[in-house]
A protein has these predicted regions:
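N-terminal metal-binding scaffold of metallo-dependent hydrolase/deaminase domains
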Residues: 1-44, 55-56
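Histidine/acidic-residue-rich catalytic or RNA/ligand-binding cores of hydrolases
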Residues: 219-231, 259-264, 281-290, 307-323
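Acidic, glycine-enriched loop/beta-strand segments at the rims
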Residues: 13-25, 280-281, 287, 346-355
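Active-site gating loops and adjacent loop-to-helix segments of metal-dependent hydrolytic enzymes
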Residues: 72-105, 147-150, 156-157, 219-244, ...
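Alpha-helical scaffold segments that flank or form the walls of functional sites
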Residues: 74-144, 165-177
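His/Asp/Glu-enriched, well-ordered alpha-helical/loop segment
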Residues: 239-246, 288-355
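Metal-coordinating catalytic core of metallo-dependent amide/deamination hydrolases
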Residues: 134-253
């Protein structure tokens, strides 16, 4: 057969032609799309032929920031800010003492299934607690592509106790054998310390891994850095050579014009989670200004604790509406937001050839 799978008569929407929709077909051979065309693919050419009439066919969505461990906690953080949640759930270590590794395994799998059912085909898992090989198995069994961010700390409540180099080597090997991308989970602003951050940067460089971290997320974390270092988190990282193309900053709600330039100059990546930012009252990120400065912004959902959903389509709508209201009707056009959900996310993980 010419194609393993053929989909005919679908409404095709893709960045390759500026999202100009057309009725057409695609052919897939050995997991790769090898043909995109106007008109039909004949049934006889395909092992499996699917009639896409009335359906939209577009690239899979990318969720660049998610905490699958938190899906079991959906709804428990409603009507609370992140700081209030920190206080409310500190006594259980963010539910650590209430759930076991099996619970976390299935919480992640539920997250990945929800993501797939809403069109997401790549997801970044930001782990609070490592599950070793089970982290890889949870994602591989569901069949979603993704990146796994292993926290650099043995326990995220103890910022100076790092996992070993041998552990990271084995973890990276397990991820790559499963077709997943290994990432190092960094630290948040309340744990900033120059030697600690440079140590994380050096480990990531030695292992050939990207770093993801919560960055400029809210006012209380911003104030911690301001009081400790008399500057902002972004400026602090920039001037200590801790921002580069291997850093993925999540949220980035509080960024001045100068800090946006610093992000752009360093080629750091940004993943914004607009519904999370609204739900826990973090604020409105200056996304239009980031786009204007050439920063490739991606989308994420965060964990269900801070969103109640794993649906990137909802994030696209939220991104559009909040900035239309805040910055004007054409501050972010539809094509730009589609890029955030697809090709920008792919570029974040060096997968642009797949999009």
């Amino acid at each position: 057969m010419k194609y393993d799978v053929g989909i005919s008569n679908a409404i095709i929407v893709s960045s390759h032609n500026g999202y100009e929709p057309f009725i057409g077909s695609i052919g897939v051979k050995e997991t790769r799309i090898t043909c995109v065309m106007h008109g039909e693919i004949e049934k006889e050419e395909c092992e499996i032929w699917i009639d896409g009439t009335g359906k939209i066919l577009m690239p899979g969505l990318v969720n660049g920031h998610c905490h699958g461990d938190m899906t079991l906690a959906r709804g428990l953080g409603d009507d609370m800010t992140l700081l209030e949640q920190n206080h409310a759930f500190a006594d259980t270590g963010w539910f650590y003492t209430l759930i076991n590794d099996e619970d976390r395994f299935y919480s992640r799998q539920l997250t990945y299934c929800e993501a797939l059912l809403s069109g997401t085909t790549f997801i970044m898992e930001n782990m609070y607690w490592g599950l070793g090989k089970e982290s890889v198995r949870a994602m591989k069994e569901v069949g979603i592509r993704g990146a796994l961010a292993e926290d650099i700390r043995i326990d995220f409540m103890r910022p100076d106790e790092f996992v070993s180099g041998e552990f990271l080597d084995e973890y990276k090997k397990q991820c790559e054998e499963a077709g997943l991308i290994p990432v190092i989970g960094g630290i948040s602003e309340e744990d900033y310390e120059t030697k600690r951050l440079k140590r994380i940067r050096d480990i990531a460089g030695q292992k050939g891994m990207m770093i993801t971290c919560h960055l400029a997320e809210n006012t209380w974390r911003r104030e911690i850095v301001q009081q400790r270092y008399q500057t902002s988190a972004i400026d602090y990282l920039y001037h200590n050579n801790l921002l580069d193309e291997n850093v993925i900053g999540s949220h980035v709600v509080y960024a001045t014009g100068e800090e946006i330039h610093q992000l752009a100059q360093s080629n750091a990546k940004v993943v914004n989670t607009p519904l999370c930012e609204m739900k826990i009252c973090d604020g409105i990120a200056p996304i239009p200004e980031m786009v204007q400065n050439g920063i490739r912004v991606c989308l994420g959902t965060d964990g269900a604790m801070w969103n109640n959903s794993n649906d990137i389509f909802r994030e696209m709508k939220g991104m559009s509406l909040i900035h239309t209201m805040n910055s004007g009707i054409r501050s972010l056009d539809t094509k730009t937001i589609l890029d955030m959900a697809t090709v920008n996310g792919a570029m974040c993980f060096d997968l642009e050839k797949d999009y």
